[in-house]
């Protein structure tokens, strides 16, 4: 496992060789050279950092709060002192704060994100909530975690893994840093499985969200990318297979709101 801090590129899966000779990756539905993607995707998250709740409200019709509560309830954080969790792509603290509160403020959560703007928002919120003593903020790469193996009791990632360029590497790193008996949980937008709901959600996603995003934040492009990135993410069964391939056991998932989002679980046994 790498011990160096790197830069993660929040884009989709590797695609093909580009004209410049570098590999191409998906940026939403667009193919971009790997040398361009870092700036493109980081710019998206710099833009939305201070309006992250608005973004999630638009993407989920407000349901992300319920899904996050369910994620932490399924995790069931321990109330014993010394229990540790790593929240990846968790810059603004939504999951970490819930974990600390659910543990009776016993848990210590490390919040890792590649984007400094997102981490800055998280620090401000943590101070206001009086949770800063239970948290550590780390700017680093999900594919090259700067931690020793067998360091954490739990690993969580919510609405972040679809933006990692090499999902298999991120999953492998998750497995490495978890202690034996540790839990992996991933909440992510997924494939809608209800015939009527999928059409309604597509209409909302591709037509309404970018327009509303532009009205509220003056930025339609960032919201278009975020919608497109959801469609590029593997289906529930395919992602579960990737988790198993990384070494996790007892892999399972739960659909939320007809599959608009899915919560995946795995154990390092």
Swiss-Prot record:
InterPro entries (alphabetical): SAM-dependent_MTases_sf, UbiE/COQ5_MeTrFase, UbiE/COQ5_MeTrFase_CS
Catalytic reactions on record: a 2-demethylmenaquinol + S-adenosyl-L-methionine = a menaquinol + S-adenosyl-L-homocysteine + H(+); a 2-methoxy-6-(all-trans-polyprenyl)benzene-1,4-diol + S-adenosyl-L-methionine = a 5-methoxy-2-methyl-3-(all-trans-polyprenyl)benzene-1,4-diol + S-adenosyl-L-homocysteine + H(+)
GO biological process terms held by the UniProt record: aerobic respiration; menaquinone biosynthetic process; methylation
Entries under Pfam families matching the protein: Ubie_methyltran
Keywords carried by this UniProt record: Menaquinone biosynthesis, Methyltransferase, S-adenosyl-L-methionine, Transferase, Ubiquinone biosynthesis
EC nos: 2.1.1.163, 2.1.1.201
Binding site for S-adenosyl-L-methionine: 92, 113, 141-142
Gene Ontology MF annotations: 2-methoxy-6-polyprenyl-1,4-benzoquinol methyltransferase activity; demethylmenaquinone methyltransferase activity
Top-level division of the source organism's lineage: Bacteria
Listed pathway(s): Quinol/quinone metabolism; menaquinone biosynthesis; menaquinol from 1,4-dihydroxy-2-naphthoate: step 2/2; Cofactor biosynthesis; ubiquinone biosynthesis
Family: Belongs to the class I-like SAM-binding methyltransferase superfamily. MenG/UbiE family.
Function: Methyltransferase required for the conversion of demethylmenaquinol (DMKH2) to menaquinol (MKH2) and the conversion of 2-polyprenyl-6-methoxy-1,4-benzoquinol (DDMQH2) to 2-polyprenyl-3-methyl-6-methoxy-1,4-benzoquinol (DMQH2).
The protein, known as: Ubiquinone/menaquinone biosynthesis C-methyltransferase UbiE
């Amino acid at each position: 496992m790498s011990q160096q801090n790197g830069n993660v590129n929040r884009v989709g899966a590797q695609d093909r060789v580009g004209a410049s000779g570098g590999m191409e990756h998906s940026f939403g539905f667009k193919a971009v050279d790997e040398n361009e993607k870092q700036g493109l995707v980081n710019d998206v998250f710099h833009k939305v950092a201070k309006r992250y709740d608005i973004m999630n409200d638009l993407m989920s019709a407000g349901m992300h709060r319920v899904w996050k509560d369910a994620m932490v309830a399924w995790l069931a954080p321990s109330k014993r002192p010394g229990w540790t969790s790593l929240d990846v792509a968790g810059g603004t603290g939504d999951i970490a704060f819930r974990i600390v509160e659910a543990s009776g403020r016993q848990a210590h959560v490390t919040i890792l994100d590649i984007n400094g703007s997102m981490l800055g928002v998280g620090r401000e919120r943590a101070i206001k909530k009086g949770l800063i003593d239970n948290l550590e903020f780390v700017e680093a790469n999900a594919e090259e975690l700067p931690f020793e193996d067998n360091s954490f009791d739990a690993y969580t990632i919510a609405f972040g893994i679809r933006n990692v360029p090499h999902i298999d590497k991120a999953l492998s790193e998750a497995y490495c840093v978890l202690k034996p008996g540790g839990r992996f949980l991933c909440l992510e937008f997924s494939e809608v499985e209800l015939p009527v709901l999928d059409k309604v959600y597509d209409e909302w996603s591709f037509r309404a969200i970018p327009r509303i995003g532009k009205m509220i934040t003056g930025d339609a492009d960032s919201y278009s990318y975020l919608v497109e990135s959801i469609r590029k993410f593997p289906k529930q069964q395919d992602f579960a297979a990737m988790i198993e391939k990384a070494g996790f056991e007892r892999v399972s998932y739960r659909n939320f709101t007809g599959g608009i989002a899915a919560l995946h679980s795995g154990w390092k046994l």
